[in-house]
A protein has these predicted regions:
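C-terminal transmembrane helical hairpin of 12-TM major facilitator-type secondary transporters
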Residues: 305-350
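Helical-face signature of the major facilitator-like transporter fold
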Residues: 15-19, 23, 56, 119-124, ...
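Loop-to-transmembrane helix entry
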Residues: 43-54, 147-154, 256-287, 331-335
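Transmembrane alpha-helices of Major Facilitator/SLC transporters
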Residues: 61-62, 272-297, 317
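C-terminal ends and interior cores of transmembrane alpha-helices
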Residues: 83-110, 312-327
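Helix-to-loop junctions at the C-terminal end of transmembrane segments
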Residues: 61-78, 288-303
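Intracellular loop-helix junctions on the cytosolic face of multi-pass helical membrane proteins
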Residues: 1-10, 102, 106-121, 125-247, ...
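Helix-loop boundary and gating motifs at the non-cytosolic
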Residues: 2-58, 228-265, 352
């Protein structure tokens, strides 16, 4: 009997790797995209915002479409495998393109801004194409109940560890090293498991999961109005989170380098390390807090109240960043990113539990 049939820990570890790879690609994007566009290609803060805008637009289309299609197709020996392979290979290629946007621009004849938008859009499309199938395959290959819960717990743990690792690499070795390591990890952690995991030809009843088409009245499922309330609240949270992802580098440049656009190589690398350490602190809090604090607290006061408290604390952190502005020391930034990490820990864990219980 194989590890997959026995549901051994090595199988769970292997099963978590494709989702981890996509999460790592996203972490590389968060740590390095704004920095490299500003420092290497000298794009203005407004143009950096335009490049980042491509991502959410891609996600709005790609995730729902792929989520619906991947339940109903079978090619390349799997239902999820094709999307995991396409997403993983494309994401790794787009990460590799980031340090070579000038060369890509020269080859295609597009301006540097247009090239950056195309690469960022394709990167986000690739991540979104892969994300749902990498999570769906966990449900496909595990029986409902404790085994499936364990599968998602493994995914969250391994993904969280690699998210912290991405920031550590950026802080210690620099963002260029992070990008190149990301290219290799995203490719290997997607491609190898995709060929080692054997998918069932037919989906059982327990594997038909989380499809929005299955919201039927009178069958004990979540009410659509309730879901919309949760989605709306979560959307406002992401206004703050996405703003941080895009513009923290500009905040740090204003606070610690006088807002100068003409930073030298050493100053630019220092700015990149400040950003990586900041996100590393946030990711570390987000990694350890759900199991150690949030889950026990939610059992006492409820999921919604716990999430509300965490988001309120995150808002205080953002408010302090805005209030202190350019007068904030570097250690102050790191401390406030730990405060923001409390909200981040809730954002990446509790909304899904709230939806399940609604």
């Amino acid at each position: 009997m194989s590890n997959q049939q026995k549901l051994t820990n090595p199988f769970y570890a292997l099963l978590s790797l494709p989702s981890t790879a996509m999460g790592f690609a996203l972490c590389v994007q968060i740590n390095a995209l704004s920095w490299i566009l500003s420092e290497k290609y000298k794009l203005s803060i407004e143009h950096v915002g335009y490049v980042w805008l491509a991502g959410p637009l891609a996600g709005l289309l790609a995730q729902p479409i792929v989520g619906l299609i991947s339940d109903k197709v079978w090619f390349w020996g799997g239902r999820r495998r094709p999307f995991i392979l396409i997403g993983g290979v494309t994401a790794s290629l787009m990460l590799l393109a980031l340090p070579f946007l000038a060369e890509v621009s020269l080859f295609t004849g597009l301006g540097i801004l247009a090239t950056a938008i195309v690469v960022a859009l394709t990167l986000d499309l690739a991540i979104n194409v892969g994300f749902n199938p990498t999570r769906s395959i966990i449900a496909d290959l595990t029986p409902e109940g404790e085994a499936r819960t364990k599968g998602f717990a493994w995914m969250q743990t391994v993904s969280g560890f690699f998210g912290v690792l991405a920031s550590v690499i950026g802080a210690v070795a620099g963002n260029y090293a992070l990008i190149y390591i990301g290219v290799a990890l995203v490719l290997v952690l997607n491609v190898v498991p995709a060929f080692l995991l054997k998918e069932p030809r037919e989906l059982g009843a327990t594997a038909s999961h989380d499809s929005p088409t299955e919201l039927r009245a009178g069958q004990g499922t979540t009410k659509l109005s309730r879901l919309l309330h949760i989605y709306l609240a979560h959307a406002f949270t992401w206004l703050g989170v996405q703003t941080m992802f895009v513009f923290l580098f500009a905040y740090a440049r204003d606070a610690f380098f006088g807002g100068r656009m003409d930073l030298g190589d050493d100053e630019g690398k220092t700015l990149g390390k400040i950003i990586s350490i900041s996100f590393g602190i946030m990711q570390t809090v987000g990694f350890v807090l759900p199991v150690l604090v949030l889950n026990p607290l939610a059992k006492k006061i409820g999921l919604v109240r716990t999430h509300t408290v965490c988001i309120f604390i995150m808002a205080i952190g953002y408010g302090a960043l805005a209030y202190f502005g350019t007068g904030l020391p570097i250690l102050g930034l790191y401390a406030l990113m730990a405060v923001v990490g409390i909200g981040w820990a809730s954002v990446v864990s509790l909304p899904f539990a709230i939806m399940s219980d609604s």
